[in-house]
């Protein structure tokens, strides 16, 4: 056998070794998405904590502008109510406030600011952030957060016209997700 008989790879040879299945981009991306979904589903019960289920508690509250809100009276109007618990110091709550304000144009919303500011400061905060102060209830002591069993903010409770808590979401939820839940709860 001569030296020229040997086949040696040259720069022109374009033979590639196939990637193992787990290194293919679509497999990596699918596994990443699956991992995030699994993590979300595992963390979700911890975030939900011991939130109440069943009938919503009786609520007779006053907003920072002095307006009286009665949850049971709102339920009797035949539309669902969104109870939104948030805090001024919560960055996720800040991200969702525009959606909550838009929902309040179509549905009744009880907007509970928990463990945040006094009434005057909260009124200034509402004006500065273009929020409707007639919907904001000051829960400085955290009473309503405890009553609803929320361990984190934002916490959203969709209450059906029957007064039953239909859906609970803790953490960021899109306005469309909340609208869908509100619509579904009145069927």
Could you tell me what each predicted segment is?
Residues 1-62, 187:
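N-terminal targeting signals for export/organelle localization
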Residues 69-70, 166:
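Generic structural signal for well-ordered beta-strand positions
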Residues 70-94, 100:
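Short active-site neighborhood of thiol/selenol oxidoreductases, capturing the structured segment around
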Residues 158-187:
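Thiol-/selenol-based redox modules, centered on thioredoxin-like
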Residues 82-83, 109, 156:
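Hydrophobic beta-strand anchors of alpha/beta hydrolase catalytic cores
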Residues 94-129, 140-146:
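Structural microenvironment flanking redox-active thiols in thiol-disulfide oxidoreductases
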Residues 126-162:
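Short, internal strand/loop/helix patches
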């Amino acid at each position: 056998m001569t030296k020229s008989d040997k086949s040696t790879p040259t720069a022109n040879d374009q033979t590639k070794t196939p990637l193992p299945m787990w290194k293919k981009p679509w497999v990596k991306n699918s596994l990443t998405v699956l991992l995030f979904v699994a993590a979300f589903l595992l963390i979700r019960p911890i975030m939900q904590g011991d939130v109440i289920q069943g009938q919503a508690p009786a609520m007779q509250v006053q907003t920072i502008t002095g307006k009286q809100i009665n949850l049971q009276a709102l339920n009797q109007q035949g539309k669902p109510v969104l109870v939104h618990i948030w805090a001024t110091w919560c960055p996720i709550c800040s991200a969702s406030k525009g959606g909550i304000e838009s929902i309040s144009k179509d549905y009744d919303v009880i907007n509970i600011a928990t463990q945040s500011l006094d009434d005057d400061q909260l009124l200034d905060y509402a004006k500065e952030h273009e929020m409707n102060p007639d919907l904001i209830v000051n829960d400085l002591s955290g009473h309503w957060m405890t009553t609803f069993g929320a361990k984190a903010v934002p916490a959203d409770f969709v209450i059906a016209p029957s007064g039953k808590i239909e859906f609970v979401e803790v953490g960021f939820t899109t306005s469309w997700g909340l609208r869908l839940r509100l619509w579904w709860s009145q069927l």
